[in-house]
Amino acid sequence: MKNKPLAFQIWVVISGILLAISILLLVLFSNTLRDFFTNETYTTIENEQHVLTEYRLPGSIERRYYSEEATAPTTVRSVQHVLLPENEEASSDKDLSILSSSFIHKVYKLADKQEAKKKRYSADVNGEKVFFVIKKGLSVNGQSAMMLSYALDSYRDDLAYTLFKQLLFIIAVVILLSWIPAIWLAKYLSRPLVSFEKHVKRISEQDWDDPVKVDRKDEIGKLGHTIEEMRQKLVQKDETERTLLQNISHDLKTPVMVIRGYTQSIKDGIFPKGDLENTVDVIECEALKLEKKIKDLLYLTKLDYLAKQKVQHDMFSIVEVTEEVIERLKWARKELSWEIDVEEDILMPGDPEQWNKLLENILENQIRYAETKIEISMKQDDRNIVITIKNDGPHIEDEMLSSLYEPFNKGKKGEFGIGLSIVKRILTLHKASISIENDKTGVTYRIAVPK
């Protein structure tokens, strides 16, 4: 059914609900309806009996008044009446062949026990249920008589059948008419969906300039807002990728141009740095820069892949990793002093190789901007391990603080890089956080790692 039009699906659902409710009501109220029709049968018998005994009482006892007779004094032909003498011995049983003598005998026995003037009864006669009312205390031509009024069960069945036909007709009409609200509801629901479909198709073709307009707050509205959110993120991602591509091209082009320029100079017998050795040193330095940038780009791609995978973290010593990185990098500026405050060995869950890269990127920044010293402290409490790294270099511009983690963000010294972007992604993989703040004497990096 899911391949059918929405209007048809809604109509089928509405019709199914209506039909199920109708069947359920018929099942639940079948006994109630049976009792109702039984009572209705007795009421009809009593009404007809009242009309007959009060206004048109026949003058002949033991005469049956058949409902089929055109001259019958009753108004409802399904009800039949018989005048009987109150004393069974006075009954001649004439003209009653259609009623069994055993039934007439039973009627007299019931009448003998009957204290009320009128009472309801039922019995099986010739395999068919009969509802009857006995009314005593009548007088016909000076003779005591009683009126036996009865109706067959088929009368009750006729009432039930008539009501059932009416219910079926009403249900059929309602189900057919439900097609109208189904079509209206389908159009009401599908109109925004069709619009969303067109927008999504255009977005799939990278035509995402036009916003998705949503003027409702229900589930369809939420879907529209989600599509608009997706469109905005795709636009932002597209712009980021273009900017990233431009920055990568610019960042890689500089060392390549230096290497090519110096290489061509050597071929021409010119040594820009005075001699061959110094000139080759420049080429080697630029090649190392180029290699590092390429490695960082590859590492950033690797982190993007790991972000989508479930990675198992092991316990390792963050103190040992930090000391190893410091030992490797501190020779870049021998004049800097290092102050390390670590109370004890600290174990934490994570990937040692990623933390090595993280600390390397942070400390390279510290070394680049520090004036005289770098301070490192590590502490832990019940919930977090806090790593604080501080340098006494110049403050970071306020407008730069919010964009430090963006790839190829241009630093104060005019350098592009992705070091802090790598730091941020590694911390995200470890559910850790970082804050970079200016203080009175320099810049402080504070990392909080949950245990």
Curated annotation (Swiss-Prot):
Transmembrane residue ranges: 10-30, 166-186
Gene3D superfamilies reported in the protein's UniProt record: 1.10.287.130, 6.10.340.10, Histidine kinase-like ATPase, C-terminal domain
Recorded catalytic activity of this chain's protein: ATP + protein L-histidine = ADP + protein N-phospho-L-histidine
GO MF entries: ATP binding; phosphorelay sensor kinase activity
Enzyme class: transferase
Protein's organism: Bacillus subtilis (strain 168)
Segments in the Extracellular topological domain: 31-165
UniProt topology in membrane: Multi-pass membrane protein
Disulphides: none
PROSITE patterns in the record: HAMP (PS50885), HIS_KIN (PS50109)
Phosphohistidine found at: H250
UniProt keyword annotations, A-Z: ATP-binding, Cell membrane, Kinase, Membrane, Nucleotide-binding, Phosphoprotein, Transferase, Transmembrane, Transmembrane helix, Two-component regulatory system
Localization per record: Cell membrane
Main localization category: membrane
Domain HAMP: 187-239
Domain Histidine kinase: 247-451
UniProt-recorded name of the protein: Sensor histidine kinase CssS
Pfam families xrefs: HAMP, HATPase_c, HisKA
Enzyme Commission number(s) of this protein: 2.7.13.3
Gene Ontology CC, one term: plasma membrane
Function (record text): Member of the two-component regulatory system CssS/CssR required to control the cellular response to secretion stress. Required for the transcription of htrA. Could detect misfolded proteins at the membrane-cell wall interface and then activate CssR by phosphorylation.
